[in-house]
């Protein structure tokens, strides 16, 4: 007769704020989408933006699309954890769902730029794990933007012009990944998430677990 299989040990921990940034076309959105599809413990922090909705985007799934006036109302009432102006449009992170997720031990994914990442680091540094995704070459970055076929040529050129300034902030991130192969880059992100979830300072339930472990007296 086989011994009964014990249940997995569950140790309470605080949620993780996983920030993934990159210049447009480097692959952060694809990596983020794949991570959400394969890891049920991660939820997406849906940003608000004044940017026009692309044909492939769904309200409330990819972004909450707002007018400039609506966005300013949220910003001025301190309802946003961070906000930034990118390519002439405003982006921001709603405060309430993030703070609730952290307290409940749920991980949140942030697909935001360096300005937003910087603000999150300043406000909630203990919870933030930041990853910057680089393209293998600028030529490949340009090719990816054209293959995406969702922006006008003028917008693509603006994104390319801004990409060098964005890449200059790579040193501000905890981890940096070169996305020359999507599967390899995704595997690296998964490894980072697994390791960060095991950090001692994030697992507040470990104190009770160790105390009970030391108090346990095995029966003979």
UniProtKB/Swiss-Prot annotation:
It catalyses: GMP + ATP = GDP + ADP. Its main location: cytoplasm. The keyword ATP-binding applies. Residues 15-194 form the Guanylate kinase-like domain. InterPro entries: GK/Ca_channel_bsu, Guanylate_kin-like_dom, Guanylate_kinase, Guanylate_kinase_CS, P-loop_NTPase. Keywords: ATP-binding, Cytoplasm, Kinase, Nucleotide-binding, Transferase. SMART domains: GuKc. This is Guanylate kinase.
């Amino acid at each position: 007769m086989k011994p009964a299989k014990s249940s997995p040990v569950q140790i309470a921990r605080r949620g993780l704020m996983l920030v993934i940034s990159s210049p447009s076309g480097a692959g952060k959105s694809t990596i983020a989408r794949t991570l959400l599809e394969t890891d049920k413990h991660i939820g997406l922090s849906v940003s608000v933006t004044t940017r026009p909705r692309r044909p492939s985007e769904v309200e409330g799934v990819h972004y909450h699309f707002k007018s400039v006036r609506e966005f300013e109302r949220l910003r001025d009432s301190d309802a946003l954890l961070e906000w930034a102006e990118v390519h002439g449009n405003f982006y921001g992170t709603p405060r309430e769902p993030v703070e609730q997720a952290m307290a409940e031990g749920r991980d949140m994914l942030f697909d935001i730029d360096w300005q937003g990442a910087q603000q999150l680091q300043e406000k909630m540094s203990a919870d933030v794990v930041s990853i910057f995704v680089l393209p293998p070459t600028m030529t490949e970055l340009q090719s990816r933007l054209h293959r995406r076929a969702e922006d006008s040529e003028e917008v693509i050129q603006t994104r390319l012009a801004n990409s060098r300034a964005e890449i200059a902030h790579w040193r501000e991130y905890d981890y940096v990944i070169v996305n020359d192969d999507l599967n390899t880059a995704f595997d690296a992100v998964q490894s980072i998430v697994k390791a960060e979830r095991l950090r001692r300072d994030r697992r507040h339930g470990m104190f009770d677990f160790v105390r009970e472990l030391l108090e346990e007296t095995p029966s003979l």
